[in-house]
Amino acid sequence: MRTSYLLLFTLCLLLSEMASGDNFLTGLGHRSDHYNCVRSGGQCLYSACPIYTRIQGTCYHGKAKCCK
């Protein structure tokens, strides 16, 4: 009986850490901004976009530009 309480307690601690973390469950199924940029035909660049292209979004969590 004591062991089952201990297991239940550790399970609750683990689940509470996951919930307060990086929103593990809401992050499932979301694509990275780099993936979305390349999938739409763009390219991720840290420098300015080349001539005849424009900024369509960001890549690498806002550190680079998605040029298309």
From Swiss-Prot:
Key word Disulfide bond present in the record?
Answer: yes
Q: Which GO terms describe its biological process?
A: antibacterial humoral response; antimicrobial humoral immune response mediated by antimicrobial peptide; calcium-mediated signaling; defense response to Gram-negative bacterium; defense response to Gram-positive bacterium; innate immune response in mucosa; positive regulation of flagellated sperm motility involved in capacitation
The answer on whether this UniProt entry bears the keyword Transcription regulation reads no
Primary localisation category: secreted
The leader peptide range reads 1-21
Q: Name one GO molecular function term.
A: identical protein binding
Sorted alphabetically, which InterPro entries does this protein's record hold?
A: Defensin_beta-like (IPR001855)
Q: Where in the cell is it found?
A: Secreted; Membrane
Q: Which domain of life is it from?
A: Eukaryota
Q: List the disulfide bonds.
A: 37-66, 44-59, 49-67
Cross-referenced Pfam families: Defensin_beta
SUPFAM superfamilies recorded: Defensin-like
List the propeptide region positions.
22-32
Record keywords, A-Z: Antibiotic, Antimicrobial, Defensin, Disulfide bond, Membrane, Secreted, Signal
Q: Which GO terms describe its cellular component?
A: extracellular space; membrane; microvesicle; sperm midpiece
> Its function?
Has bactericidal activity. May act as a ligand for C-C chemokine receptor CCR6. Positively regulates the sperm motility and bactericidal activity in a CCR6-dependent manner. Binds to CCR6 and triggers Ca2+ mobilization in the sperm which is important for its motility.
Please describe the quaternary structure of this protein.
Monomer. Homodimer.
Family note: Belongs to the beta-defensin family.
Q: What is this protein called?
A: Beta-defensin 1
In its UniProt entry, the species of origin is given as: Macaca mulatta (Rhesus macaque)
